[in-house]
Amino acid sequence: MRVKGTNTTRIRRKKWLKQASGSFGTRKASFKAAKQTVIQASKYAYRDRRQKKREFRSLWILRLNAALRAQGMTYSVFINELKKAKIVINRKVLSELAIKEPNKLNLIINTIKKPTNKPTVAKT
């Protein structure tokens, strides 16, 4: 006699259907569609956990650049001067300073700003 794995099969299918419970229509009712939906959602979640890090770093840089341009400095020059001055502050903290405590960011800008004493060469 053939053995039907009813309990095991039902439990396995219910697990997939429970994971797809927030979906719409057939995607939450049909086992096959639910399984495909959950697998694709897992792929997107995996990808987006990595993208999230990139997007936040871009946001911090964007905010910082906007605050720095108001002070007459660009982001790239600012980061270069920070590295030369051996000041180690990450972009997240700098972004928060730019938004919540601009006076402290101005203090950092003033410490790294140097008067430009470049010799001018006269063309003859």
Swiss-Prot record:
GO BP field: ribosomal large subunit assembly; translation
Name this protein carries in UniProt: Large ribosomal subunit protein bL20
PANTHER family linked: 39S RIBOSOMAL PROTEIN L20
SUPFAM superfamilies: Ribosomal protein L20
Function: Binds directly to 23S ribosomal RNA and is necessary for the in vitro assembly process of the 50S ribosomal subunit. It is not involved in the protein synthesizing functions of that subunit.
Family in the record: Belongs to the bacterial ribosomal protein bL20 family.
Molecular function (Gene Ontology), one example: rRNA binding
GO cellular component, one term: cytosolic large ribosomal subunit
Stored Pfam families: Ribosomal_L20
HAMAP family the record matches: Ribosomal_bL20
Keywords: Ribonucleoprotein, Ribosomal protein, RNA-binding, rRNA-binding
